[in-house]
Amino acid sequence: MENHTNKTYQERMNKTALSKFDVIEKHLDKGIKLLDFGSGFSPEFIKQVQQTGAHYVAYDVSQIVQNQLKENNIDFLTKEQLVNAEDEFDVIYLSSVFHELMSYLSRPERRETFAMLDKALKPDGVIIIRDWGHGRQPRRPVALEVTSKDVNDEVQTWVEALIKNSIINTPWITEDENDNVIVPYIYKHVPHYLYEIMFHVVWGLGSLERESKESYALDYHHIDKWICQPYNYKIVHQYEEYDETYLPHLQKYFKLDSLPWPTKIIYELKKEAC
């Protein structure tokens, strides 16, 4: 789906440019060739990469993004060019992209995509995935309380859309001692479903149609299944990112003192020696 006509989407992606760069800075140096897969157009991030001396190359299926890259003289690949690339990149970076591949691509399309990336990476290269994820959480139900009646209907609209699109199962809504639903709602479910609700809602209803079709609760099992096992990679480093700039936006909708779950999880993958 074309995200780049949406002003809110582009602004949100550009605001996270610093976090996006921090993840890969240690891998960049003069002569390093980076493929930013599913790049979008983030001028500040591109500038930061180029200032390290690394060679930045973008890849995005969006014609709008390709036009922006072309107008700004940024190197990018078409799909035909990427399909033919072999042992070309030192670093392949998927930032907020893996969950979209899981959400929108068929199984054959996923296999084709990851085979293409494996072929394009140098034997000693690294794949870095930065994406949504709730981390390793207990399976017991927890609560997520809506801030006020003013936003209660908006949150419930998201919940209903996520249920309809099979992103979550129906959460419990807390009742009082007389079996009346408490308003504003207090949702109860296992953490990964509440994670989906919390980070979807913060986009606002203008993004409902697009974002409600995407699953955010990724974990290492997805990466192991689709990349590590088929192509002999190992997750050599994994850590969580807590971006506190999300908190005031989340507090508009939910009673939170701090971020209960990570905003992103980072995975570094290296090819196993044969």
Where are the regions a protein language model picked out?
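Short glycine-dipeptide loop
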Residues: 121-127
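A short, conserved alpha-helix within the catalytic core of class I
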Residues: 101-116
